[in-house]
């Protein structure tokens, strides 16, 4: 296990199709100190897919870098996590929030929210088999009728995860509604492991307001960084900034 501290950080979210290495370097140049690679399919990493293995690659500029994987089978998750650690990942994150049909039909991503006990076993085996911290990223549930994020968060913590990222929408909502920071705050209060809040952080003042009001340990920024990669600098300096 590394000494990775998941508190007091602003993370660049794992952005599928957007968070490639050049983009991450751009964010680093504008103040981002914690980066994550694009989601990688664990089973493809295990098969040796070049394109998937490329998602585990970090640049020397990325001093604090994590890899996110999508997995349904513990053996694949562990092997992919070990491969990520061997390539310099400081931690490995399990995606339990991706709403895309191709992901959920394979039993990965948001599907795992519907099977908390299976998710717990998966996380426990990852924690046991991967030599760096294991984290989990979830949504609030499969739908508003299946809002079980508190249960999922408890299971994840009991399985040994080092931290939990919570995106404030359900799988069904995708991005159709505003992120529910009241729900994120509730989960942060219920858990002892660091909870990282994610969703609708588009400005430096939203970042500070939501961080303080919710009591989360850290923030994770996705679309806000795609809109302006220098948002990390703005958050640190507490003022708007425009590149010239």
Q: Where do the language-model regions lie?
A:
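Flavin-dependent oxidoreductase catalytic cores
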Residues: 1-244
